[in-house]
Amino acid sequence: MSRSAIQVAKAATYLPDLVEVQRSSFKWFLDKGLIEELDNFSPITDYTGKLELHFIGAEYKLKRPRHDVEEAKRRDATFASQMYVTCRLVNKETGEIKEQEVFIGELPLMTERGTFIINGAERVIVNQIVRSPGVYFKDEQDKNGRRTYNASVIPNRGAWLKFETDKNDLLHVRVDKTRKINAHVLMRAMGLSDNDVIDKLRHPEFYKKSIDAANEEGISSEDQALLELYKKLRPGEPPSVSGGQQLLQTRFFDPKRYDLGRVGRYKINKKLRLTIPDNLRTLTNEDVLSTLDYLINLELDVGGATLDDIDHLGNRRVRSVGELLQNQVRVGLNRLERIIKERMTVGETDSLTPAQLVNPKPLVAAIKEFFGSSQLSQFMDQTNPLAELTHKRRISALGPGGLTRERAGFAVRDIHPSHYGRLCPIETPEGPNAGLINSLATHARVNEYGFIETPFWKVENGRLIKEGDPIYLSADLEDECRVAPGDVATNEEGKIMAELVPVRYRQDFETVSPEQVDYVQLSPVQVISVAASLIPFLEHDDANRALMGSNMQRQAVPLLRPERPLVGTGLETQVARDSGMVPISKVNGTVSYVDANAIVVTDDEGNDHTHYLQKYQRSNQDTCLNHRPIVFNGDPVIVGQVLADGSACEGGEIALGQNVLIAYMPWEGYNYEDAILVSERLVKDDLYTSVHIEKYEIEARQTKLGPEEITREIPNVSEENLGNLDEMGIIRIGAYVESGDILVGKVTPKGESDQPPEEKLLRAIFGEKARDVRDNSLRVPSTERGRVVDVRIYTREQGDELPPGANMVVRVYVAQRRKIQVGDKMAGRHGNKGIISRILPREDMPYLPDGTPVDICLNPLGVPSRMNVGQVFELLMGWAASNLDCRVKIVPFDEMYGPEMSNQTVQAYLKEAAKQPGKSWVYNPKDPGKLLLKDGRTGEPFDQPVAVGYAHFLKLVHLVDDKIHARSTGPYSLVTQQPLGGKAQQGGQRLGEMEVWALEAYGAAYTLQELLTVKSDDMQGRNEALNSIVKGKPIPRPGTPESFKVLMRELQSLGLDIGVYTDDGKEVDLMQDVNPRRSTPSRPTYESLGKEYEE
């Protein structure tokens, strides 16, 4: 036990701030990005050139937001600040200058936890990974198997320029994937003479052929070249020299149209070894000539020219919030520029002011569109703190300017050697997005150019130097170094002990002596993402299962009484703290006041800092957000200390599930195929009970016939059903509601047309106007029940912003406690998931030698084929820890402490546990890790010893309550007349192609017929069948399904004369059953078809 897992937890270096990616990017946008855009955008001159409008970007101001974060959530508002910028209008003729502060729009602000609040909902802007601008060299094989090379110059925005060689060794160029142009034609058009070009090239003899080809085509002067260029780029228009000149100028040399960006300029300078200054963001002649030179070197295979790998992380960069927002602001400002120019031309020059010129609408619209409907602006996943944190660290290759799922090949999705320590190789979704959506590794950070860096310790002469901050390297720099893994063994002085060290060098593995090592990885965890790093014994799990494990931790529902894991990895505290779900002390000081709603910390100067707590708020995923204080009055606290537990936290650590006693043994077939057998204790002791808060809302609208009214007086509803409503007709807080109960009473005025004939008759006789309204109340949907925890009323008078046409909106929040039940999904942390198949009484569960019944029985066959052995290690380590009454932290990849370390550590702990008084039965050396269990029903021992222990098990958000669903009569699809699908639409169960095959194979012809006709879309048949069932008559024969008729009509609409005929040659009329009065068939009523049958 000398260097054991205990020390591993100490070695778990503290991670950097995990949401830094979002925060620093937004800070850059406020400090630099926005100013950059405003400056690029001014001055704007009108078409005559006598008026100029300057934006003074550096002096922009943000006003304090109208609502704070909580208020914005409550009012469904956006947490945003108004932007004002100083504008200067210069009249060139009179020399007059007008200066004014102008409102240019609202900018949503980021909250402290890295999210945005848009219309009351928390949203996250996901980081996007795109191809970096720069120059790329590729090779392609033509159909004869000959290699040709090409070079593409890719800007941040603007036209692509692609140089390529062909089989005759001629150089061509394409602009934006148009037709090929001889490369020398472009050179001449750019005003370069033959000698200018030849002097720049290291192997001009290769280029001479292209010059000759250009001369043969009769293009020998700059003017001819420009004409030729214009013809190729704008075919069909009359070419002119000035047109060609302007075309070339705007396409590549105008900073408004063509921009390499800082990154593009940096990458081109680096690849082509140029020294062009950073602020020159357009193409230069030097760029083009160097690219040609490099391409020729590639073709001749000289001069150390290398091809580029576009999937290398040195060639892909991350665009975070700041940059995405900056691009959006640019779009808005470009639209604004057009408007300003028009207004300058139209308006009276003398009386114009900057405020009249600048219209904030286009900019507001662009920003709103980005936050509201961009693919990268996502509704935050708030199921638990880990889900929230991972969502903010997600990196997506999809989105505007990125890839699409369909076009992304295998290479883009694959793990690349440069991902090491930057993107997690494990955490990615299953299915069509696999490999396109990644997660940032734990220690990775994004540098100023948008490339992902990862930290290393420097090694000098075989000695590790751990002084100061570690050194961050981006992927292309790391390729040139020899890097040893983070788990190399070192002695006290930091000297590497091994004679030979495995290193990574230029994306290959080598073994070198310690003196040759340049860097060592910071920590073994730095390769994987936050979610994966919470899995203990991760190194013993197959990657596919580890992937499921890290994805399922994000779906764990916060439980009523969370319990932190017995076996953890040491990162739990940091995850809870950085997720933003727990309140953190802002100062050093002492706690001066604590209650359920607020904690006050008094700092050393005597100032009070109040931290407000969330009580039973609803999260985006309907789970419950709640804070419980964990500090007491008088406690000293330091900056960054956790003051209260959030949901799924205990003691400031993340606690997603419960530690339960698990046995790996089959039990009467109840855990066949990943099913799970659980004990009643989990239900009785509320171990897996969670609180879910559902939101119901109703709006009273203004209709043509008058306003809808929220009231207690509802027609045809008995007084007892109104018992829980207050005098306004809104449910009282604290009431318990079942499905079908009224939450908010609402009546809608109904027109004359809505009345049935008998009502009209009564009206004619008595002449009095009955209260002509119809009940339109908000009721609890089927399968839902719970207690009303909050009611919010929004009206115009209070100044709330309501949707157009609404007079009042009422929101009711209903909370329910859900105990675990058959059909719920549970999972461990190693991708071992299953559905509960049966809940057994405690006394029937198998029990341990000391009489403790186990909580869960899992199938042992779930382990070998899936190769996630980590669960067995966790089980036994948890067993030892619970018997020793301690908790264990084990960082993944513990081999640096010796071979087979996990095994040794677990064994050592189990032996230690068996030494406790009265615990000798805990560990049996003959059968290590197994115990002889007895059957709870008979008391007989089972045949074989069974692996038993404690593991951290989660309840996932896929709850059976949300999925179970039944339909009797419900809505039908309009065209096919088949029942809709899905729970939300009250849908039916789909009888698909394969189910039809099963019935066909069985020969169940009549069952199949009625499933395809009267139970689905034979309109006439289903109404008649309903009629006959109600009246107890025999069910008539099914007719033609509507979908068949639709098919026939579609074929007819193609102009095919197609019909259906009976045996005796009579044509069947497919249109006969459509009632001419009602084009949309209503739900069937008992008499809805006038056809009565002969008795």
Curated annotation (Swiss-Prot):
For this record, the Gene Ontology CC terms, alphabetical, are: DNA-directed RNA polymerase complex
Arranged from A to Z, the UniProt key words for this protein are: DNA-directed RNA polymerase, Nucleotidyltransferase, Transcription, Transferase
Task: Please state what class of enzyme this protein is.
Answer: transferase
Q: Where is the signal peptide?
A: none
Q: Which InterPro entries match?
A: DNA-dir_RNA_pol_bsu_ext_1_sf (IPR042107), DNA-dir_RNA_pol_bsu_external_1 (IPR019462), DNA-dir_RNA_pol_su2 (IPR015712), DNA-dir_RNAP_su2_dom (IPR007120), DNA-dir_RNAP_su2_hyb_sf (IPR037033), RNA_pol_bsu_bac (IPR010243), RNA_pol_bsu_CS (IPR007121), RNA_pol_bsu_protrusion (IPR007644)
Question: PROSITE patterns in the record, alphabetically?
Answer: RNA_POL_BETA
What the entry lists under Pfam families is as follows: RNA_pol_Rpb2_1, RNA_pol_Rpb2_2, RNA_pol_Rpb2_3, RNA_pol_Rpb2_45, RNA_pol_Rpb2_6, RNA_pol_Rpb2_7
Tell me which Gene Ontology terms the entry assigns under biological process.
DNA-templated transcription
Q: Which family does it belong to?
A: Belongs to the RNA polymerase beta chain family.
Give the protein's biological function: DNA-dependent RNA polymerase catalyzes the transcription of DNA into RNA using the four ribonucleoside triphosphates as substrates.
Q: How does it assemble?
A: In cyanobacteria the RNAP catalytic core is composed of 2 alpha, 1 beta, 1 beta', 1 gamma and 1 omega subunit. When a sigma factor is associated with the core the holoenzyme is formed, which can initiate transcription.
UniProt protein name: DNA-directed RNA polymerase subunit beta
Organism of origin is Prochlorococcus marinus (strain NATL1A)
The major lineage groups are:
Bacteria, Bacillati, Cyanobacteriota, Cyanophyceae, Synechococcales
